Amino acid sequence: MRLRPEIVATPAYRQGRTAAADDFKLSSNENPYPPLASVVAAVGATLGGLNRYPDAGGADLRDKLAERHGVDVDQVHLGSGSVALLAQLIRAVAGAGDEVVYSWRSFEAYPGLATVAGATSVQVPNRADGGHDLPALAAAITDRTRAVIVCTLNNPTGPVVTAAEFASFMAEVPGDLLVLLDEAYHEFETDEAAVNGIPLLSRHPNLVVLRTFSKAYGLAALRIGYAVGPAAVLDAARSAALPLSVTDAARVAALASIEAEDELMERVARIAMRRDRLREALIEQGWSVPQAQGNFVWLATGEETAAASDAFSAAGLTVRAFPSEGIRISVGEHEYVERPVEVSADLGGKLPNGHPGKRLG
């Protein structure tokens, strides 16, 4: 069988491990709250039409999103999660011999998206604090670059790109180069300096902003996200999309979630408070913890990552391990903030001086 060698060599996306029956899953940055009753009812009302294809164009949801963001409806594109939209946009601009530039470590799907499009990944190392090095990212752009991905806040390390940093970056980027601003965790951000991409669209005709209903809105199982950007770019993404990939269940759940947004954002605020409490506790233990602005925190466990992951697992906590780099701990239910702190206290005490995960002083 003549398979593309670069595809064969590319690891498949690795989902966060499923927790054992009595364990707690803190590996996939899922919203710990169950769906609202109004959302469940909206989804249930679609089940009688499972024999029919979905309204994948989603005019009602696109209208709602366009209204709330102050853009034209043709500047909104729906997809089965923001990662599907990223795939479409990259396929629309990049192919063999082209480059896609992004920071690393970042979202684990980026390398595969570039490879499937036939393009080459150019990975720019993060700063020591886990944030994007935007001057280095701009310097990595060449004549072969077709897209740059900026992940803010950065998954899995946590820091945001500030509005000032992004403005300086965009001033260095060629106007015909597509910039993809991945804002999957935008609703969790509490740092007022963080960039907010959608108001910048009128200033940057080469910018597309991606959002999702998976995280803050708790619709991870239904797979729905959206892109906001220039109509011509999104038309190209639609041409690169798999047909009928957005289900009616996902669409009506998103609409119902927007109607119940106040209640959902109260949940988000509680998760952000738990996140801050978890980070502060880890810092008090002596860990060097990057800025955390999502629904997770990052521990730079380095070569001790496998042992650290095993220690969390032994305590009934399934976390996301990135071999030889670090561990991402999702913020779960209220009662499970203390349990990661208990495990990390023992781990932190064993770190040698000079370890990247150990706070100086």
UniProtKB/Swiss-Prot annotation:
The modification N6-(pyridoxal phosphate)lysine is found at K215. It catalyses: an aromatic L-alpha-amino acid + 2-oxoglutarate = an aromatic oxo-acid + L-glutamate. PROSITE patterns: AA_TRANSFER_CLASS_2. The keyword Transferase applies. SUPFAM superfamilies: PLP-dependent transferases (SSF53383). Keywords: Aminotransferase, Pyridoxal phosphate, Transferase. Gene3D superfamilies: Aspartate Aminotransferase, domain 1, Type I PLP-dependent aspartate aminotransferase-like (Major domain). Its EC number is 2.6.1.57. GO terms for biological process: biosynthetic process. Its cofactor is pyridoxal 5'-phosphate. GO terms for molecular function: aromatic-amino-acid transaminase activity; pyridoxal phosphate binding. It holds the Pfam family Aminotran_1_2. Homodimer. Belongs to the class-II pyridoxal-phosphate-dependent aminotransferase family. Aminotransferase that catalyzes the conversion of aromatic amino acids and 2-oxoglutarate into corresponding aromatic oxo acids and L-glutamate. This is Aromatic amino acid aminotransferase. It comes from Leifsonia xyli subsp. xyli (strain CTCB07). The gene is pat.
